[in-house]
Structures are given as structure tokens and as C-alpha cells.
């Protein structure tokens, strides 16, 4: 029965893939000859500094330690590597599994001389040293939960060589040693944490901030097949997680525990074990719910919280119109899809172009779904993406996607996130981080409070806005033009008790990953202005006030919790009514509401589908008393015609390569291509079904 079910799932996946091929090929036949996304024109930007969304965690600007940290201003760093599940902290040996021909070695500490390679915890000490060198405030370490660690560094391990593996135990019944016994063939996790506390201090005293409960445990069976490990079940993962978390808390109660660190939507849904998931799918909508609920129950039983952060890995599975994997391809089609792929995290109107996303569409957009699960099953648990990547680190599309996702993480209340870079050149991704963390080279950064910002529904642009918790007038705004070839004029309207008269401008785009200072915005009148954006460019606007009216913002002391506010102002209701503007509320539909998070809601909407070419819709003035949903900061999809407005800020134009307009293709050619593709898909479906029938008969 298991094989039949597994075969049926394979057939279903193949059919979804075939349908995706057909849909993309027929629906976007012109993509074979030109762009699949069209440039859009003017965009209306509405910002309201008095509508605070949440506190932005400083830890979202993190990175994995697999790249140089010298030229990027990050706030968190973590260990990365597929071999971490088998890392032996006592000797620094690790086995690289099927990805590395099952070689056990000291590769993780290869930068050190041989006489110190066996120093206990050297790999982690190296992480702490780098964090200190580059002034990175938060460090996170991965613990081992698989049950086996490399027992030597002598090369390829063959099946049956049990002596070459050390047993991993979570708790040591004897005293925890300052220096471990490397000859007992056992590696203790509580002793590992104790060793790190002795050398670096408790988390509350500046030591290691948190510990991951292994890394991508759903892949143990495949990655370490020679160990003959059974497929991981949901119950087994929770059991091990609770035991290891208890060990961590017993040694360092102030350290955070993060898990389950599984990767991809399929893992979120069923832990990549559909057969086991049948036992729970009637009770829980996806594995995330099961994990949170059972970790909560384990915490209640133990009298202490055992999971502080719901941690996940996310690597885009999106494919271009030509079915190229976006994460590892930098063609024109992959680049334009990459700049849209971030929307799978928050936008219910977007479907990632992948078989997995289509199969599990009901579990997207991802962040609102995860937050709803947290509220339902384990309230006050934080959310992190300790490994993520949208690719394109060596070109502007990757820089735009990176700038976009950082804005999303801040706006959506993510606690911690670490870019997991791929390739030697990730200069554009690093620049995107630096734009938020040090845009002027003098330490100036995006604010720590997210405020309302909306772009009227334009999928070819994004906007994010912030103020400081101790300075409500310190408005910073990120604007992004995703148009491949066209300039875009942003018509910006700011609703605020502050009057802004100018804005400094910083940007990167085109073929350059350097942040440059542009001409300042000087044409702000009544908190409104027009701003011209070059194609494929990201901007940071630092606003300066003309007159700051008395205002005090009171926030919670916990910088990681959702913000609660009380605004005191001596501005008259008449003045406030004149300054406020209409805003759209798009995200109220995409994110489940919590009664503790919202008291007011607005369902105002603006449709841009009927906008005529060359026409700009005026912003409607409303009274200050208009209710606005706190969660309505989504950047939703729409399209407007291309418009270029003169008199806007002059910025040096950076034209990307391959921007010529595609030649029109005769309809007859398109029809022929459609027919050919349809024929191929039909053959694919026939082959899959035939294979299934034959296999069934053989059974």
C-alpha cells in the first residue's frame, strides 16, 4: 500500500508539473520571444507615519557564515553547512553525506593549522571570533540531533563502518567536563552548550544568542543513507526536539531555542513524509501546526518554554517562463521572475511558478499562514528564516529581490533572518543589506518601527517606510523600480503630523552594486512630491522636517514584540483633517487578524485596472478620524501604463544589458508553438499514466 500511495503522489506531482509546463507555455508563449512582465508607468505612493505597524527586529539583517563578512553590515550570523548534522564538536570532524561522497574530514576548520584542528568547539569559536571582529551582535549555533556524528576525519565512510560514527546524546548523567572525553565514542549536547557558556558566557551576558535544533532534519534519510535511518516522523522530530531543547535550557536558560529548521513548502506541509502525515492531516492543516501544538504541550509538561522561535529555511523554487530555476539562473526571464518571487511570502494574489507551490497553494502566502499557526497553537513564539535565498547575487535582480525581502521581513514582523548566499559573487545582495544598515557610509540605517506604506497595487514597484521609536519624525523610505527598461514616476503623498521639506537620496541599480548619493528631493509641497525612478533601481530616501510638532510615541519595552502605541499631539483636528490622505487596505485580506493586535479596520480599496494611459489618479483627502487597518501595508499587484514625468529628481541613468524591445512574433508562429507544446505535454501525461498502470499491474 505504501508503494502504491508513493507512486500515486509521484503521478500527481508529475501531472501538476506537466500542467505548469502547459500553462506557462501556452499562456505566455510570447515569453519565448520577449518579456513575460510588462513595465508599468506612474505609481501612487501613500505613506502614513501615524499608522505604526510593528517594531522592526534588528536581527532580520543576518547572514550565514559561508561568505566573507568584511564588506556587509549584518546584525546576526549563523553556521551553515549540510554537514552540520554530523558535526563532532569535540574533534571538529564532520561527514558531508551523499552531497560530499560520505567523506569525513576537518573541512569546517580547514583554515586553521593542523596542530589546533582538534581543539574542541573550534568551528564555533571561529564563528564567535568573526562576530567580534565585524561587530555582529547576535550569533547562532547549530546543535546535532540526528544521533550520529563523525568519529574521525579519515575520508570516505562505507556502509557498515559503525566504528567511524560517534553516538550523539542530549543529556549526560555524569558531571559536565570542561574538556570533553574524546575517547568514549559519545558526544554530549548539554556538555557542548556548557563548554560554550564557559568560554563565551551565558546568552544574557553576551554569549551565544540561540541554538538551532539541527538543520533540515527531514533530509537525514536521504543525505545519510549509509546510516540506514528510518524516515523521520512528526512524532519523532517533536520528541527529539523537546529533549534537546530541555538540555539547552538546563544549561543556559537565557538562550533561545530555534526549530525545526525544515526547508521548503513541502516540508512545512508534511515533513516530506506523506505516509506518516496521514496520521495527523485530519487534525492539523499542515506539519507546522502539529509541531507548534506539540512543542507547546511539551513545554507545559516541563514547566518551561522549549521553543522560542519557529525557524524555517526558504529557498525559492520559482521557475522562469522558460522553466529555468530562478535561484541558480541569471537569464533575462529568470531575473524578472526573481523580482516577483518574494511575493510568495506575503501576497495572496501571487502564485509561485513551481509545481510545489501550485500543489500546496492553500498554504500560501507563507508568512501570514505561519503567523496564524503561531497565534493558534503556540502564542508569543517568534518567527525566523535562518536560511533563505532568491538567487541573483551577482546582478541587480538579486539586489532588488534582497531589498524587497528585507522590507517584507520588517513589515511582517519576522524576528530573525539570515541570507544563505550561493556563489562567490553576491555583491548586489550585500549592497541591499547595506542600504538598510549603512546607506550613507556613516552608520545611518532604516528605522526600527514600520509604518504604513502602499504603492496602489503596482507589481513592478515596492515601497517600505519606517520611523525611529525615539523619533517619530525620522522618516526613511525604500522605493524600488522593477521595470526592466522604463523609468517610473512615483507620486508620493505623506500623511503625518510632521512637515517634510526635502529628502536625501541614496541608490544602487543597473550594472553597479555601489550605493551612490543622488540629487536631493527639494520639491516637497504639503508633504507631496513627484520622484523619478530609473529602471531596475533601489532608492533610500531620508526625509528632513521643516517643522516638528510635539508628538510622543510610547512603545513596549520588549523590542521584539508587536508594537503598541499611544500618540500625544497638540495638533488640532481641523489641521489633522487637512493633512491626512486616503490609503488602500490590501493586507487586511491576506493576514488573519488577532483581536489583541487590531481594534480598527478599513476596507478601502483603489482599483488601478481602469487607469488610462498617461492619466494619474488624484489622491483623495479624508479626515484624520478615518480608521486604517494596522496590517494594511501589503504591496499588491496591478498594472498601469508607462508615464514619464518631467521636473522630477534627476538621477544618473543606469541602463541594464539586453534591454532592447523584442520583435513582434506573427500569430501563426505563436499558434504553432502552442500546438507543439500541447503535444509534448500530452505525451508526458500519457507516459506517466502508462508507467503507473504498468507498475500497478506488476504489483
Segments (PLM) and residue ranges:
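Carbohydrate-binding surface patches
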Residues: 458-499, 536-547
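C-terminal membrane-anchoring or membrane-association module
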Residues: 679-699
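C-terminal low-complexity, Ser/Thr- and acidic/Pro-rich disordered "stalk" regions positioned immediately N-terminal
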Residues: 555-668
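Noncatalytic carbohydrate-binding groove/subsite architecture in carbohydrate-active enzymes
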Residues: 188-195, 200, 234-397, 402
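Sec-dependent signal peptide cleavage junction
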Residues: 22-36, 666, 688-692
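C-terminal beta-strand-rich structural cap/linker in extracellular carbohydrate-active enzymes
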Residues: 522-552
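N-terminal substrate-binding region of glycoside hydrolase catalytic domains
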Residues: 38, 44-191, 217-233
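Glycan-recognition and catalytic regions of carbohydrate-active enzymes
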Residues: 395, 402, 406-476, 512, ...
Amino acid at each position: 500500500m505504501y508503494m502504491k500511495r508513493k507512486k500515486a503522489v509521484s503521478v500527481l506531482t508529475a501531472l501538476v508539473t506537466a500542467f505548469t509546463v502547459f500553462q506557462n507555455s501556452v499562456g505566455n508563449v510570447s515569453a519565448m520571444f520577449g518579456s513575460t512582465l510588462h513595465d508599468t508607468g506612474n505609481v501612487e505612493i501613500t505613506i502614513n507615519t501615524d499608522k505604526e505597524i510593528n517594531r522592526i527586529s534588528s536581527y532580520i539583517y543576518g547572514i550565514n557564515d559561508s561568505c566573507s563578512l568584511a564588506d556587509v553590515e549584518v546584525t546576526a550570523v549563523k553556521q551553515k553547512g549540510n554537514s552540520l548534522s554530523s558535526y563532532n564538536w569535540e574533534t571538529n570532524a564532520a561527514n558531508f553525506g551523499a552531497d560530499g561522497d560520505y567523506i569525513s574530514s576537518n573541512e569546517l576548520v580547514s583554515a586553521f593549522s593542523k596542530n589546533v584542528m582538534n581543539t574542541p568547539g573550534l568551528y564555533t569559536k571561529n564563528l564567535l571570533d568573526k562576530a567580534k571582529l565585524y561587530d555582529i551582535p547576535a550569533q547562532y549555533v547549530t546543535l546535532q540531533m540526528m544521533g550520529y556524528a563523525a568519529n574521525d576525519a579519515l575520508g570516505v565512510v562505507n556502509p557498515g563502518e559503525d566504528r567511524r560514527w560517534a553516538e550523539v546524546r542530549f543529556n549526560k548523567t555524569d558531571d559536565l567536563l570542561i574538556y570533553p572525553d574524546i575517547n568514549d565514542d559519545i558526544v554530549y549536547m548539554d556538555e557542548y552548550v556548557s563548554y560554550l557558556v564557559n568560554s563565551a558566557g551565558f546568552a544574557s551576558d553576551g554569549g551565544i544568542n540561540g541554538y538551532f535544533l539541527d538543520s533540515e532534519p527531514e533530509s537525514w534519510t536521504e543525505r545519510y543513507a549509509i546510516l540506514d535511518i528510518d524516515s523521520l516522523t512528526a512524532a519523532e522530530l517533536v520528541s527529539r526536539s523537546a529533549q534537546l531543547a530541555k538540555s539547552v535550557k538546563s544549561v543556559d536558560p537565557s538562550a533561545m531555542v530555534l526549530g525545526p529548521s525544515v526547508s521548503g513548502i513541502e516540508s512545512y506541509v508534511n515533513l516530506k513524509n506523506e505516509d506518516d502525515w496521514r496520521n495527523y492531516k485530519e487534525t492539523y492543516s499542515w506539519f507546522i501546526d502539529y509541531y507548534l501544538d506539540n512543542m507547546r504541550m511539551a513545554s507545559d509538561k516541563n514547566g518551561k518554554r522549549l521553543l522560542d522561535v519557529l525557524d524555517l529555511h526558504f529557498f525559492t523554487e520559482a521557475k522562469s517562463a522558460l522553466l529555468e530555476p530562478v535561484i541558480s539562473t541569471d537569464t533575462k526571464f529568470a531575473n524578472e521572475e526573481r523580482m516577483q518571487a518574494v511575493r510568495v511570502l506575503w501576497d495572496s494574489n501571487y502564485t509561485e511558478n513551481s509545481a510545489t507551490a501550485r500543489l500546496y497553494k492553500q498554504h500560501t502566502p507563507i508568512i501570514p499562514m505561519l503567523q496564524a499557526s503561531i497565534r493558534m497553537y503556540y502564542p508569543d513564539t517568534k518567527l525566523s528564516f535562518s536560511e533563505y535565498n532568491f538567487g541573483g547575487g551577482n546582478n541587480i535582480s538579486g539586489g532588488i529581490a534582497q531589498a524587497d525581502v528585507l522590507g517584507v521581513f520588517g513589515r511582517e514582523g519576522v524576528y530573525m533572518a539570515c541570507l544563505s548566499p550561493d556563489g562567490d559573487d553576491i555583491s548586489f545582495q550585500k549592497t541591499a543589506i547595506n542600504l538598510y544598515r549603512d546607506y550613507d557610509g556613516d552608520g545611518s540605517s532604516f528605522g526600527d518601527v514600520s509604518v504604513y506604506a502602499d504603492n496602489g497595487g503596482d507589481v513592478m514597484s515596492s515601497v517600505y517606510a519606517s520611523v525611529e521609536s525615539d523619533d517619530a519624525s525620522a522618516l526613511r523610505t525604500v522605493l524600488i523600480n522593477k521595470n526592466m527598461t522604463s523609468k517610473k514616476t512615483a507620486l508620493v503623498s505623506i500623511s503625518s503630523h510632521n512637515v517634510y521639506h526635502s529628502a536625501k537620496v541614496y541608490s544602487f541599480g543597473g550594472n553597479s552594486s555601489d550605493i551612490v548619493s543622488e540629487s536631493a528631493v527639494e520639491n516637497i509641497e504639503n508633504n507631496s512630491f513627484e520622484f523619478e525612478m530609473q529602471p531596475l533601481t533601489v532608492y533610500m530616501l531620508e526625509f528632513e522636517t521643516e517643522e516638528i510638532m510635539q508628538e510622543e510615541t510610547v512603545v513596549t519595552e520588549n523590542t521584539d514584540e508587536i508594537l503598541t502605541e499611544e500618540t500625544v499631539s497638540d495638533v488640532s483636528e481641523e489641521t489633522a483633517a487637512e493633512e491626512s490622505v486616503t490609503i488602500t487596505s490590501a493586507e487586511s485580506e491576506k493576514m488573519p487578524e488577532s483581536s489583541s493586535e487590531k481594534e480598527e479596520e478599513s476596507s478601502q480599496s483603489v482599483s488601478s485596472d481602469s487607469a488610462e494611459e498617461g492619466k494619474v489618479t488624484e489622491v483623495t483627502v479624508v479626515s484624520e478620524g478615518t480608521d486604517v487597518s494596522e496590517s494594511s501595508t501589503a504591496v499588491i499587484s496591478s498594472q498601469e501604463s508607462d508615464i514619464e514625468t518631467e521636473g522630477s529628481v534627476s538621477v544618473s541613468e543606469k541602463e541594464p544589458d539586453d534591454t532592447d524591445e523584442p520583435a513582434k512574433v506573427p500569430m501563426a508562429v505563436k499558434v504553432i508553438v502552442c500546438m507543439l507544446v500541447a503535444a509534448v505535454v500530452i505525451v508526458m501525461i500519457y507516459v506517466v499514466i502508462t508507467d503507473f498502470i504498468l507498475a500497478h499491474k506488476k504489483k
